[in-house]
């Protein structure tokens, strides 16, 4: 009588690594407990965050903007619930767009980027932070530096003897430039008859009771820490 063949034991096939977790594995259960505890702690910290009006933690600071470049004003704030941010320049609201960019670098840091710097960007910038519990604000200045230049030089002039001659140049620059005038390469020595004035955007040379000796080549020059410029004009008195 032949004996029956012994029954074969089922062969366990291990799942591919990373595909299946055995929830009965003590290590898996321990890891799950730690994850849940960490998540509950995170929720608790978030829920315990104090609600209230916004506060400025690190104020804005004055910055220097070079013509043609960009500048950034940065402020660190504390606010919960999340606030509404508004930036303004000299009291006028600035819209987020190509020229002015609202930047949120992390939950507590906000910034304003001013692009394509020009002299018109000089001024006081303010941030206003508002949430349902209140508001706070802060301000700083953007100081603009522009290489000096002569926007429009003086015109060549013909005058009659005894009349008054004026030569005017339109100038630009920040910091405000040093300005000078020369005649035939020599610095002009001012007196009550020949003198020049310097305004915020113009400089004017005045020659009273002009004589033929006042004829010549006149030069105006401007210079600041970022550059210099010059322009010429011819005066003929007869």
UniProtKB/Swiss-Prot annotation:
InterPro entries: Cell_Adh-Cytoskel_Orgn (IPR050958), Ig-like_dom (IPR007110), Ig-like_dom_sf (IPR036179), Ig-like_fold (IPR013783), Ig_I-set (IPR013098), Ig_sub (IPR003599), Ig_sub2 (IPR003598), IQ_motif_EF-hand-BS (IPR000048). Residues 29-55 form the IQ domain. Residues 54-143, 147-236 form the Ig-like domain. It holds the Pfam family IQ. The keyword Repeat applies. GO terms for molecular function: protein kinase activity. Keywords: Immunoglobulin domain, Repeat. Gene3D superfamilies: Immunoglobulins. It comes from the Eukaryota. This is SPEG neighbor protein. It comes from Homo sapiens. The gene is SPEGNB.
């Amino acid at each position: 009588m032949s004996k029956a063949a012994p029954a074969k034991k089922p062969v366990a096939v291990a799942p591919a690594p990373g595909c299946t977790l055995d929830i009965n594995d003590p290590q898996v259960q321990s890891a799950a407990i730690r994850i849940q505890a960490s998540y509950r702690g995170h929720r608790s910290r978030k829920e315990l965050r104090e609600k209230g009006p916004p506060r400025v933690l690190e104020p804005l600071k004055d910055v220097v903007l070079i013509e043609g470049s960009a500048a950034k004003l940065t402020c660190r704030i504390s606010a919960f619930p999340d606030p509404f941010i508004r930036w303004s320049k000299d009291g006028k609201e600035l819209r987020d767009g190509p020229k002015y960019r609202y930047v949120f670098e992390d939950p507590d840091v906000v910034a304003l980027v001013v692009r394509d710097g020009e002299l018109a960007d000089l001024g006081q910038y303010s941030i206003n932070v508002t949430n349902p519990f209140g508001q706070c604000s802060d301000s700083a200045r953007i100081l603009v530096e522009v290489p000096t230049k002569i926007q429009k030089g003086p015109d060549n002039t013909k005058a009659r003897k005894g009349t008054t001659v004026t030569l005017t140049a339109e100038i630009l620059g920040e910091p405000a430039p040093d300005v000078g005038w020369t005649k035939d390469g020599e610095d002009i020595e001012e007196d009550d008859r020949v003198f020049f004035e310097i305004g915020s955007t113009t400089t004017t040379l005045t020659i009273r009771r002009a004589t033929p000796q006042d004829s010549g080549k006149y030069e105006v020059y401007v210079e600041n820490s970022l550059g210099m410029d010059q322009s010429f004009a011819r005066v003929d008195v007869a």
